Amino acid sequence: MSGVRQFNECPRALRMTPKKPVPIDSKPAWRIIERTMNKSAKLAELRHSLARYGLPPERTPLATGHPQADAVLGGGLRPGSLHEIFAQGWSGGGFAVLLALLAASRKSFFWIRPDYEAMEYGAVSPHGLLELGGDPRQMILVRTRNAVDALAAANDVLACPHVGALLLEMEGMPKCLDLVASRRLAFAAGESGVTVFLLRNGAAAQPSAALTRWQVRSAPSLPGDDDWGKPVFDARLTRHRLGGLGDFLMQWNPEDGCFTDVSKSEANTSAVVRAPARRPAVEKIAI
């Protein structure tokens, strides 16, 4: 019985014992090291979580050739990321396909567009792509019935890491293209390393996981003698998750395959480029 009584009274005595503060210096060293390791693990987990929500991994920036734009972008566009391009007409398509050519380099790139986009903004011309300095054999055009099919096709393309770039064209504000869908696109782009350009025709800006957002419209070309002039775009960077914003006048140079500053360009330059090897020359074809 005494053993039972002692067992019952022992916890009461312990509860009544006043607690004394333990000095910080008296904590074992192994416990301090354990806390430091736990903090490092939590920071690593947080960085991984941020990457999954659209912040791309570190990759070499893709220089556009425009000095002011590249300076604001931190060296250029970030590969393996989602970039949005908003426009109210055909000028957005021209700017987007030039960025896709730039990002794809010598690889193939996909252009996915619903059927009604071709009826509204015109069909894709291989001759026009040739005059812009690209090779029509690089482009793989995918036409879908609606925006849902276009989004599904884009996710399938992003499963292949050997694609140079992806241009996804959308009209208006379809319900399927919400914040969750943009996060999936951004995550797939980061995993595969494929740069995605989301062309939004006639749409208003809405929350998305895009790294950059551009508002684009056409600008007058420099005067020429008897040619069309090189394409010039008034491109406004309205969102940049890793840096600043800016408004740029960007001219596409087909010979060099990059953008240049209009103020530094020579006047009366020709828009007809040298034809690639083993391909016929094309002269003065409207794009």
Residue map of PLM features:
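Arginine/glycine-rich "motif VI" loop of SF2 helicases in the C-terminal RecA-like domain
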Residues: G133-G134, F187-V194, W228, L242
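P-loop NTPase motor core
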Residues: V142-A152, D156-P220
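Conserved inter-motif catalytic segment of the P-loop NTP-binding fold
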Residues: S108-G164, E169
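Phosphate-binding/switch region of NTP-binding enzymes
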Residues: L198-P280
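Short, solvent-exposed amphipathic alpha-helical segments in soluble enzyme
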Residues: A100-L102, P126-G128, R183-R184, W252
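Helical mechanochemical/support elements of P-loop NTPase systems and associated helical scaffolds
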Residues: G65, G94, Y121, A150, ...
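Conserved RecA-like P-loop NTPase ATPase core
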Residues: A69, I85, M139, L166, ...
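Detector for small/aliphatic-rich hydrophobic stretches
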Residues: G3-W111, D115, G122, E131-R137, ...
